[in-house]
Amino acid sequence: MIIRFRSPVGMHRVRCEGSETLGQVLPQLQTILNEHGITPRAIELGKEANGKDKTNVESLLEKTIEALGFRHGDIVYVHYQVDSSETKGSANDNNGSVAVNIPNNLVPGKSQKADELEVDKELEKLDGLIPRQKTKLCKHGDRGMCEYCSPLPPWDANYANENNIKHISFHAYLKKLNESTNKRESGSSYIAPLSQPNFKINKHCTNGHEPWPKGICSKCQPSAITLQQQEFRMVDHVEFQSSELINQFIEFWRASGTQRFAYLYGKYEKYDATPLGIKACVHAIYEPPQHDEQDGITMDMEQVTQELNTIDLLAKEMGLLRVGMIFSDLTDAGNGDGTVLCKRHKDSFFLSSLETIMAAQHQTRHPNVSKFSEQGIFSSKFVTCVVSGNLKEEIDIASYQVSIDAEALVSADMIGGSTHPSMAYINDTTEDRYVPEIFYMKKNEYGLTVKENAKPAFPVDYLIVSLTHGFPKDEDTTTQLFNSVTGFPWSNRQAMGYSQDYHELKRYLHSTAASGNFNDLHDKLANFHLLLYIHSLQILSQEEWELLVKGALSQDYQEPLYKLSASPGWQTLLMIIESA
């Protein structure tokens, strides 16, 4: 049967059986309301429009549809309450409902509000104006200003072209949109300038037809999609805090001849080389359990996910986030001089279609929180780095992200890999997905921009955003979070003959820990993989673990190391490694 739920935002048809309980049917209604941007914290139902007979849902959850007296085609009036910050002055504020907590299992997709990153809060306060010097065209004094020397907005196209900036920064793009969306002189209400695209068909359409694939209308089907190069990028630069990080990552390929995959842990900081730019500062690399081959890798994703959940929590205690991933694609050139084959270039591909899909999936799992978006999230700051051969046959790094359209296409399952790595194949329409017309813009042989039909496949370059990468100008003077990258074996490197055990821990740490020299001990402890291994032993208490992290990573390490050295857990650890 179909029950019609009428709410302040319209009529919602929900399919159900008479034997189902209201608790089983309510999530469908909750999903529909969420799609209208409404997340109620209280729902009451009644058969009268004035709400005189409304009853809170908590007392009705166990009752069946038949027991409630609902029949096919009945109209049930929905009264709900939302947080005042989310109503934006709508009529829903005054519905007079009593607050009732809805159980979390009845709110699909509902999550706690996450906070924006500190770098976003910092850049939001800046205007990003690009200063200009006085020129020959200026007719004023030193204290004057004219159109030839006045500061430029951070999104200025001429400045970007002159400085070879292919993609403007995210915050420059945001300010550009906000400037046109919320004009100060208009005096109208605020409109969120950003919106996360959604290319999925709406299976809860309220336009009077059965859901897809039995029915479709212009309201529930996605519009035609036109792909073009994204003009902005969420992250502008990837900075590895130590060249030894990359050297140790490549060492696995040098020793085994097989490829390697890892995740990058670090922080997002302001990047001064681009107006309102952001850089991902990589402090550590973690390699999950994997089986490596010459042309790829194999991973047990369930095992990897469980392990990464723990690593993410420990990294957070160290002040780090998972900022990206890195993988190798290296083949020795056979010259005996360390050169490698150049596989990725403008005439082949930069990221294959499968790698692009993988990058989009990772970005979707790590959304960027933004209060300027209608949905509260917008794209992602997750980066993808590839270690491969360049045109000079040298080992080099290339850094990328995929566009927000790529994220939406992959989320809607509209594209897949193809036998040509540079082309993305467009999937067919099925009962589970609807694929609209997809086009892409390109320049023809006459230099004119034309629209091409993307089916059956299109160049994956339209989904890729390139980033710059590098190292600190002076690594010796740069304050690094981890003083030591080598010395203690990296995690999951048993294939190289290295294992993390008490013997390795004794060799690396025992003499320094027994000496009582806190300066040397601080340098030894400031090792990402050592800290992870010590935590996995579960010898230290939570308080002792916090002292260890503070003593290893803080500049003021004398006092925490003194307290740690006197703790029973640390003494137990020293006794164990001494007898190893």
Swiss-Prot record:
CC terms in the record's Gene Ontology section: endoplasmic reticulum membrane; nuclear membrane; perinuclear region of cytoplasm
Membrane topology qualifier: Peripheral membrane protein
Cell compartment(s), UniProt: Cytoplasm, Perinuclear region; Endoplasmic reticulum membrane; Nucleus membrane
GO terms of molecular function: ubiquitin binding; ubiquitin protein ligase binding
Superkingdom, taxonomy of origin: Eukaryota
Compositional bias (Polar residues): 86-104
Described purpose of this protein according to its UniProt entry: Involved in the import of nuclear-targeted proteins into the nucleus and the export of poly(A) RNA out of the nucleus. Has a role in the endoplasmic reticulum-associated degradation (ERAD) pathway.
Name by which UniProt lists this protein: Nuclear protein localization protein 4
